[in-house]
Design a protein with these regions (language model features):
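Flexible, solvent-exposed loop/hinge segments and secondary-structure transition points
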Residues: 2-202
């Protein structure tokens, strides 16, 4: 009986120490991971809106993001959301437009999260990816210039995906064999456009 109790006590101590060690390692790695994610996001923001010197979150935009969730879902862009909105500013503080982070859960493998730049004149400055895990050689081609650069300079209007050559100024040519991904990216972009056009300043 004493042997059993001793073994149980030893096992308990080992488990406790292991748990504490794992917890400590987790806490130690959290900060570097967060910093790496922030650095990657900042790099994407600059690629999407290169003219901007800085990006600023405001209470007004944060409130608009929260208030517009149901309205955006009702627009028929798919299962999309606007996750974040920032003002894109020049060096002198003048407003150049907005940097919008939006998501769709309708990629072939689920979540696709993008950042979209939209100027005050109503044009897209570019599109970048914050999260995407689509099929290599198919959906992951969304990150290739042939697909994502189609959005550069487009008018901020409702966009549509076409499987053939884009013939209208609101059409995005789908990635061959990756229609789900193409529609997810375009749906998230439409959510970002709708947000800026209809929810900012309400």
């Amino acid at each position: 009986m004493k042997g059993i109790l001793k073994d149980a006590a030893i096992l308990f101590v080992i488990t406790l120490v292991a748990g504490l060690c794992l917890g400590a390692v987790h806490e130690v790695t959290l900060d570097p991971i967060a910093k790496a994610q922030e650095a990657a996001a900042t790099k994407t923001y600059k690629e999407v809106f290169p003219e901007a010197a800085k990006f600023e979150q405001t209470d007004e935009l944060t409130a608009a993001v929260a208030a517009s969730a149901d309205e955006i879902l009702a627009q028929g862009f798919g299962n999309v959301s606007v996750d974040d909105a920032q003002v894109a500013e020049a060096e002198d503080g003048s407003v150049l437009g907005y940097l919008i982070t939006a998501s769709s859960t309708e990629g072939y493998n689920g979540l696709v999260q993008i950042s979209v730049g939209i100027t005050s004149e109503g044009n897209l400055t570019g599109l970048g990816f914050l999260s995407i895990s689509e099929t290599p050689g198919l959906g992951m081609k969304a990150k290739d210039p042939d697909f994502k650069d189609q959005f550069n300079g487009m008018k901020a209007q409702k966009l549509e995906v076409t499987k053939t050559d884009a013939t209208a100024d609101n059409q995005v040519q789908a990635i061959s064999g990756a229609t789900y991904t193409s529609k997810a990216v375009t749906g998230a972009t439409n959510a970002a456009i709708y947000f800026v056009e209809n929810c900012v300043g309400k």
